[in-house]
Amino acid sequence: GFDPSDTEKTYPGILTIHGGPRATFAPTFFHENQVFANAGYFVFYTNPLGSDGRGNDFADLSGRHGSIDFEHCMAVTDEVLKRYPQIDEKRLGVMGGRYGGFMTNWVIGNTTRFAAAASQRSISNWISKCMTTDIGYYFNMDQIKADPWGNPEKMWSHSPLKYANM
């Protein structure tokens, strides 16, 4: 396990991003985080912009997916690496499901700082997702303020798949 007094040992790190986005990590047992921590990873997480718990203005990401939430996750990663030099920044991973999976896709398409990623139950392309989900087509209008008939360009600009060639 992690021993803060041992400054010589390094650990791989995992940024884990919750679903939602209107959800939140709380100080409770979260199976995936515990499994990775038990395997020797330094697991860290945040409740980025778009999360519940700080009011509607903070939680409303409408039309901004993959922008300020991404910046927030990268700022938290920077701060964690600064506070815990035992984390090997060359052995970073990112993971998440649903919205966390979308953000995992977004992260790996927009930065090369993570060596591994596990995207679960995620959106990678807002256009193809629009009519192939149990959530319904209206989710796109609510979340990114676009649909394939009125503004497919905006949908594509918010799609992690667009940035997959990084």
What is each model feature region?
Residues 23-24, 126:
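Short glycine-rich, flexible loops that bind phosphorylated cofactors or substrates
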Residues 1-9, 159-164:
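Short beta-strand-to-loop junctions in surface cap/lid or active-site-entrance loops
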Residues 27-46:
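Short amphipathic alpha-helix adjacent to the substrate-entry channel of hydrolases
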Residues 12-13, 42, 116:
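Short, Asp-centered acidic motifs that coordinate Mg2+ and/or phosphate
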Residues 8-20:
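Short beta-strand element of the alpha/beta-hydrolase
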Residues 24-27, 53:
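Short N-terminal helix/helix-N-cap motif within the alpha/beta-hydrolase-1
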Residues 45-166:
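Active-site-proximal cap/loop segments of hydrolase catalytic domains
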